[in-house]
């Protein structure tokens, strides 16, 4: 038989995403165990059932849309840091063309010189 004088302890999640220890205390006038942190919640209105209320669905939909808008704002940042990595077209022209008159095109360097030496004959 359980000792009704000692509270039952359990872990509960606080509103700040912290875990703390709560306790269940025995109430002699009730058939159920009441959490010690539940005092004063007699006037609390529970969230309506989603099957009986469409307002909950519309509230959740509104929240999802608001989150999506915030995400869009977060991605509309300054993109100059990315575009600066792409060289301008003027930078792609070899400098030797002006000096040599463009008569002889330069040979392209391979990224993998060992692989380029194995050309099919």
Curated annotation (Swiss-Prot):
Structural protein required for transport of intracellular particles from the assembly sites to the plasma membrane. Binds to both ssDNA and dsDNA. Suppressed the activation of the cGAS/STING pathway by interfering with the recruitment of IRF3 to TBK1, which in turn suppresses IRF3 phosphorylation, decreasing interferon production. Keywords: Acetylation, DNA-binding, Host-virus interaction, Inhibition of host innate immune response by virus, Inhibition of host IRF3 by virus, Inhibition of host RLR pathway by virus, Late protein, Viral immunoevasion, Virion. This is Protein p14.5. GO terms for cellular component: virion component. Residues 104-121 have a biased composition (Basic residues). The modification N-acetylalanine is found at residue 2. The keyword Acetylation applies. It comes from African swine fever virus (isolate Pig/Kenya/KEN-50/1950) (ASFV). The keyword Acetylation applies. Acetylated. Interacts with the major capsid protein. Interacts with host IRF3; this interaction interferes with the recruitment of IRF3 to TBK1.
């Amino acid at each position: 038989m359980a000792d009704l004088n000692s509270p039952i302890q359990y872990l509960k999640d606080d509103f700040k995403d912290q875990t703390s220890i709560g306790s269940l205390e025995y109430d002699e006038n009730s058939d159920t165990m009441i959490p010690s942190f539940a005092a004063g919640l007699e006037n609390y209105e529970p969230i309506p059932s989603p099957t009986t209320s469409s307002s909950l669905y519309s509230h959740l939909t509104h929240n999802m849309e608001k989150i999506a808008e915030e995400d869009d704002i977060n991605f509309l940042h300054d993109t100059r840091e990315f575009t600066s990595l792409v060289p301008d077209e003027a930078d792609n022209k070899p400098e030797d063309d002006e000096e040599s008159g463009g008569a002889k095109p330069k040979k392209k360097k391979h990224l993998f010189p060992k692989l380029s030496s194995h050309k099919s004959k």
